Amino acid sequence: MWIGVISLFPEMFKAITEFGVTGRAVKHNLLKVECWNPRDFTFDKHKTVDDRPYGGGPGMLMMVQPLRDAIHTAKAAAGEGAKVIYLSPQGRKLDQGGVTELAQNQKLILVCGRYEGIDERLIQTEIDEEWSIGDYVLTGGELPAMTLIDAVARFIPGVLGKQASAEEDSFADGLLDCPHYTRPEVLEGLTVPPVLMSGHHEEIRKWRLKQSLQRTWLRRPELLEGLALTDEQRKLLKEAQAEHNS
């Protein structure tokens, strides 16, 4: 099995390639892990890999160009048939059933986010699937990527002496994140939502909240059951549901 990794900290993956069961799998050529660092695709002397989000707010997003070029390079190295996965809190929860599905792929490319995440248009144009290891926040996608690699590697013939099962984690309640956008304003014909460039902070706040509610309703509706929504949240959720069903 071949796995490509896009990460600002490729050295972290020595934990996978040099130690334990996965390290032995790499040594015996049952598993191959290759890494690409977006910093290697920058053009400025500071090797900048972050950029400001449209609409303001705390934190930064990963810069589009270096990340996009790294993904394209990994795709070229993989050839046909590689599935590109973004490790994201907004993704499908990784459980044993999901691991079994992913293990059917001979080639995977794992994109590890940092900062506040990546531009939504990169997800739309470059990513095949989003996966999450749980409803909590980490500083980056590297640990989720290593979790996925470790879990999937167990299904590679010859890696384990016998087939094994893993326990599923429990998850906390909460809303999923809203889409994020950074430069450029237009990417492959897809534009940043005008509200994020309007400068109207209250409208931006409402848009982000509404997007979060809609995503949670569409992707993880069970999370809403344990939340005591405010009057504003209920109103925005009803609007989002009406727009989606119209």
Curated annotation (Swiss-Prot):
For this UniProt record, give its keywords in alphabetical order, as a comma-separated list: Cytoplasm, Methyltransferase, S-adenosyl-L-methionine, Transferase, tRNA processing
Entries under Pfam families matching the protein: tRNA_m1G_MT
- EC number per UniProt: 2.1.1.228
GO terms (molecular function) for this protein are:
tRNA (guanine(37)-N1)-methyltransferase activity
Q: List the disulfide bonds.
A: none
Location in or out of the cell: Cytoplasm
Cellular component terms per the entry's GO annotation: cytosol
Per the record, the similarity remark reads:
Belongs to the RNA methyltransferase TrmD family.
Q: How does it assemble?
A: Homodimer.
Quote the NCBIfam families the UniProt record gives.
PRK00026.1, trmD
Q: What is this protein called?
A: tRNA (guanine-N(1)-)-methyltransferase
